[in-house]
């Protein structure tokens, strides 16, 4: 069994290679058994929205972050702007709903898969598989998830589930390395 620090180090080692094996990354993410004492300092909640908390920038090759989900919180339906997305549940449960890419304008998105992941569950998503939304369906418990994005990205597209309408969004970090970010006066949110 590996620690959270060892997981971060081993992810960094994988990304020193020229070719990245998705299955190897999935196995590594699955090999870590969540221990809140190891990652708690990065898990910063906000009662009004889910938060993206940066853990490691991986020499510009990836972003590793912890997302914190209050009861009932959800992401928008979104793409990953050609990035690979690995998710590991560190605490609680998250439901992932996958959607097919919109084929027509002003038509509801088609759900292709709906799956709930409990603690230590691992998921993978990329744009070839479609769009997705992550949500904490619990009305009383929070959830925490570890996300690895390869390559890192600063924008994505959000989609209206009812119409398929696409809107470009800038993604920001609520905290970096365990410290809340103050964006007052910042134009890019990074």
UniProtKB/Swiss-Prot annotation:
The thioether cross-link between Cys-85 and Tyr-149 plays a structural role through stabilizing the Fe(2+) ion, and prevents the production of highly damaging free hydroxyl radicals by holding the oxygen radical via hydroxyl hydrogen. Its EC number is 1.13.11.20. Gene3D superfamilies: Jelly Rolls. Keywords: Dioxygenase, Iron, Metal-binding, Oxidoreductase, Thioether bond. CDD domains: cupin_CDO (cd10548). GO terms for biological process: L-cysteine catabolic process; taurine biosynthetic process. Pathway: Organosulfur biosynthesis; taurine biosynthesis; hypotaurine from L-cysteine: step 1/2. InterPro entries: CDO_1 (IPR010300), RmlC-like_jellyroll (IPR014710), RmlC_Cupin_sf (IPR011051). Fe cation binds at residues 78, 80, 132. It catalyses: L-cysteine + O2 = 3-sulfino-L-alanine + H(+). Its cofactor is Fe cation. GO terms for molecular function: cysteine dioxygenase activity; ferrous iron binding. There is a cross-link at residues 85-149 (3'-(S-cysteinyl)-tyrosine (Cys-Tyr)). Binds 1 Fe cation per subunit. It holds the Pfam family CDO_I. Belongs to the cysteine dioxygenase family. This is Cysteine dioxygenase 1.
């Amino acid at each position: 069994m590996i620690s959270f620090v060892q997981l971060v180090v081993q992810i960094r080692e994988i990304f020193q290679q020229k070719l990245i094996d998705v299955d190897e990354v999935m196995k590594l993410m699955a090999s870590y058994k969540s221990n809140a004492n190891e990652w708690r300092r990065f898990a910063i909640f906000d009662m009004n929205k889910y938060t993206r908390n940066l853990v490691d920038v991986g020499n510009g090759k990836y972003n590793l972050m912890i997302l914190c989900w209050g009861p009932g919180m959800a992401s928008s339906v979104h793409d990953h702007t050609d990035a690979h997305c690995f998710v590991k549940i560190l605490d609680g449960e998250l439901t992932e709903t996958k959607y097919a890419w919109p084929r027509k304008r002003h038509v509801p998105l088609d759900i292709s898969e709906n799956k709930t992941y409990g603690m230590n569950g691992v998921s993978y998503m990329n744009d070839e598989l479609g769009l997705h939304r992550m949500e904490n369906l619990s009305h009383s418990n929070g959830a925490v998830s570890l996300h690895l994005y390869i390559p890192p990205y600063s924008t994505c597209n959000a989609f209206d589930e009812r119409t398929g309408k696409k809107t470009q969004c800038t993604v920001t970090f609520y905290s970096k390395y365990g410290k809340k970010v103050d964006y007052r006066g910042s134009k890019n949110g990074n």
